[in-house]
């Protein structure tokens, strides 16, 4: 997040390429991955162990099925192998070939299988998209066309589009919605707030927990909801986020009220009564938890 912010705020980037890899973890090619790992590891015992891990397969109705592609999910080594795969397929290729062929500046930001690329010129972004499709195809990967786009984004995009009354697009990355905004002095500022998807996912989690534990003591419910909410605050505690975080807090309180009413069959359990109870309270979000990100 810090690296992406630095690129958007300080570098020459008026265009942003956003993409999604379709079923990435299910389409990693084992042969290619073995070659990539062997490029840095010479110990045959470790290479054999990794091969066994990849061939572990999965079980359906008591029958073990093995696959020649994909990385087994759920284990500690799977994220490492998946990251190695994209390091060779995308990262090194971008640094050694794409950046050298671009007319302007270009910067790749990747975390696991999520990535965005900032370009100074649109022609470079379009050429990259064409080359990336071919590059991924060579290694068994495919871009999700419905989630792949080139947009105007950044401080230069804001100035140019502002002349015609338009605004830059927004994009989601690592759970945050990224927006071109301004600071108090009217200068460009990157605004990041929890995305709609991340908020809905978290609220679905709290709703499900309340449904399963609606008969627990109110004090125990309050303790667990506080832990969940503080974890959410801890991740999303950036500039501009606290209004959305407090909206999430209010929605959880509504979920809690609904659960209490269902449990007691007291549909007239009013807010005025609950707000007087010492246990009916959840922590509010502070303005900034991570000021340097």
Short names for language-model regions:
Residues 1-293:
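Non-catalytic terminal/accessory segments
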